[in-house]
Amino acid sequence: YCHINAAGDVEPCVFIHYSGANIREKSFLECLRQPLFLEYRKGQPFNDNLLRPCPMLENPECLPEMVKRAGAHSTDLEAPESAEHLCDKCHAYAACWKPEAEKLWAEEGHEV
């Protein structure tokens, strides 16, 4: 999965506006091989509960480090912000969702 914004930046998700590659400058395959996407592959799964898959919403401690290691930059065309600032807004949600997700995951017979 990926998202290409109006400026041609290839992002890992429509909600995660960070990239290190632009479709107008590189082939699609090169864009998929950008360091940020490689960081995604290295990090997945971001925890043992697949009901919490996102490195921003459910694992907000992950995305800022991934963006930093990849040397990616903000591609938000309206309001650029650091990955740290974005993810700071997600910690409360992640903390509330984690126990519910773990309960549901356990009910399906998975280890928590």
Task: Give the location of each predicted region.
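Short, acidic, Ser/Thr-enriched surface-loop or helix-capping motifs
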Residues: 4-5
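Flexible mid-to-C-terminal extensions adjoining Fe-S/redox cofactors in radical SAM and related proteins
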Residues: 15-112
